């Protein structure tokens, strides 16, 4: 099974989860931002890695906007070089709108992580030879 197939299988299982009140909105960026997430997997997820960094609890201004782990918008657009459309989730919270790559907000942990990677490895390709962030 490829990494993309594994992720799609997990997404299908997660989509089966149902929540009751007080939960009103559940964002799954692997659905509405799949295009960018797929690009990220294909561009940076292949091959053997020495280090895999796992994140939890995606923030509202990072992966929730872009579909990319630690997906600080500027880093996704300029350093990782990903382009694409992010759709709206079925139910959107009015205080947490999904603006995708147009979001003006910055995600602090993503800015730090990708900033370190850019400073240390210069290009995402060099970083991805050894590291995979998920």
Pin down the residues of each PLM region.
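A polyanion-binding, active-site-adjacent surface
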Residues: 2-134
């Amino acid at each position: 099974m490829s990494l993309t197939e594994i992720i799609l299988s997990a997404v299908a299982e997660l989509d089966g989860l149902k929540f009751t009140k007080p939960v009103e909105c559940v964002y799954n960026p692997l659905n509405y931002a799949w295009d960018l997430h797929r690009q990220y997997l294909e561009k940076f997820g292949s091959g053997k890695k020495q280090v895999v960094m796992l994140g939890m609890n995606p923030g509202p201004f990072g992966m929730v906007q872009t579909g990319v782990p630690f997906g600080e918008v500027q880093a996704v657009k300029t350093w990782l070089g990903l382009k694409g459309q992010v759709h709206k989730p079925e139910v959107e919270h009015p205080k947490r709108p999904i603006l995708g790559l147009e979001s003006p907000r910055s995600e602090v942990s993503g800015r730090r992580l990708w900033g370190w990677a850019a400073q240390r490895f210069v290009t995402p390709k060099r970083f991805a030879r050894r590291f995979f962030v998920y």
